[in-house]
Amino acid sequence: MEGYHFLLEILSKNPDICECAIIESALVIPMDFTYKMIEPIFNLSYCLISKKWFSKLQFKSLKLKKSLFALYYEDTCKITKDNLIAFMKSNSNYEVKNTLSHTKAKTLVLVGSKERPIMKKSATKIVHLIPNSELEVLQGYYHGDISINHADDYVERVKRLVR
């Protein structure tokens, strides 16, 4: 489960738990085909994860700051195949609960303009479920980009939300 899954579950079960929330790049629409392909693909390709050249390709596709590569590579090498498969399956199969509509939290939903269409659909779905929410499409941003690569912009949005 990713961090936003925990947040969405908590908001779904405890509508009064917080006053404000930020949800960034959350996938809440199950991807059935992807889910079915995860195990066979990772059974075949897991051995590549510890190869530095492959990690560099993966890292580049994530659009992270170059200064984060050493940490990324170190963490990636520690992930077991079973944990990676479980994580990917959980992520691709998550479906937001309708009880999310009961939350009272003022919520900012962020998604990058350069994210995949399913991520934008997920953001829209969340905004339709949460009564006091706002969607912000971040122009030129990729998946998870603002909190990782543009922390100052992220902090400004947090400050605006809690005012």
What is the role of each PLM region?
Residues 12-16, 125-128, 160:
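Short, well-ordered alpha-helices that flank and scaffold nucleotide-derived cofactor binding pockets
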Residues 133-163:
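Catalytic active-site module of serine/aspartate enzymes centered on a nucleophile-bearing elbow/loop
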Residues 114-118, 144:
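Acidic catalytic loop of the alpha/beta-hydrolase fold
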Residues 8-48:
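Flexible "cap/lid" loop of the alpha/beta hydrolase fold
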Residues 105, 119-128:
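Short alpha-helix in the alpha/beta-hydrolase fold that links the catalytic acid
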Residues 1-9:
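Glycine-rich nucleophile elbow surrounding the catalytic serine of serine-hydrolase chemistry
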Residues 32-34, 48-101:
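Conserved alpha/beta-hydrolase catalytic His-Asp/Glu region
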Residues 103, 109-111:
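Short beta-strand/loop motif that positions the catalytic acidic residue
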